[in-house]
């Protein structure tokens, strides 16, 4: 990636997922390390909050609220597996409010955005001629966003992620808080399907520092 944004393609993850699925999985003789959340932790701002609760699986519950638009309030929960990710999440497109487009472009973002790769909402109207892929595509895309943010931990997580009007910055702060105290989590081994090296040394109290994995 040579810029601040990855190629938008169709605005969802499906055009990244399909080639990976087609390529298949190569089994390796290395254990799969997981991070299990052991305590409830939360971060918030004036607009929303995100938190982790202990769980034996990875589960996400996301709620959004866009008053005075056709988005409105939406809530979606999902136990994340390979199958549910492909079936329920990966094809949900990004979206924006029409009134925000000019501001984003002035800041150098969404320069390639169009009705072919984003849902544009103008009040109670969806500007895309073909409409939505699902009636709750908005909240599902927010869950897709969150799952991508959580992947920056560097290894699969076991826990229940819950969000109310959260976003990328809050998700980053939640990961920072999770790894700031070793009593918040436990590293466990799950098998030998895919090797993951867990790296958390780069987590700091600053929300400008992001996690890394090798």
Indicate residue ranges for each PLM-predicted region.
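C-terminal regulatory domains involved in ligand/effector binding and gene-expression control
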Residues: 1-214
């Amino acid at each position: 990636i040579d810029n601040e944004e990855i190629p938008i393609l169709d605005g969802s993850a499906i055009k990244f997922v399909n080639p990976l699925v087609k390529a298949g999985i190569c089994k390796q003789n290395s254990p799969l390390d997981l991070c299990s959340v052991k305590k409830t932790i939360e971060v918030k701002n004036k607009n929303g909050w995100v938190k982790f609760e202990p769980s034996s699986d990875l589960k996400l519950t996301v709620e959004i609220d866009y008053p005075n638009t056709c988005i409105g309030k939406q809530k979606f929960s999902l136990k994340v597996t390979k199958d549910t990710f492909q079936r329920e999440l990966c094809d949900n497109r990004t979206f924006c409010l029409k009134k925000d487009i000019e501001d984003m472009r002035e800041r150098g973002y969404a320069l390639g955005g169009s009705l072919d790769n984003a849902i544009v909402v103008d009040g109670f109207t969806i500007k895309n001629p073909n409409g939505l892929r699902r009636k709750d595509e908005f909240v599902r895309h927010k869950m897709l966003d969150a799952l991508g943010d959580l992947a920056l931990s560097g290894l699969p997580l076991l826990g229940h992620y819950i969000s109310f009007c959260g976003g990328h910055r809050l998700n980053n702060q939640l990961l920072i808080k999770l790894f700031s105290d070793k009593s918040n989590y436990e590293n466990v081994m799950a098998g030998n399907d895919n090797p993951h090296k867990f790296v958390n040394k780069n987590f700091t109290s600053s929300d400008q520092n992001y996690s890394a994995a090798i």
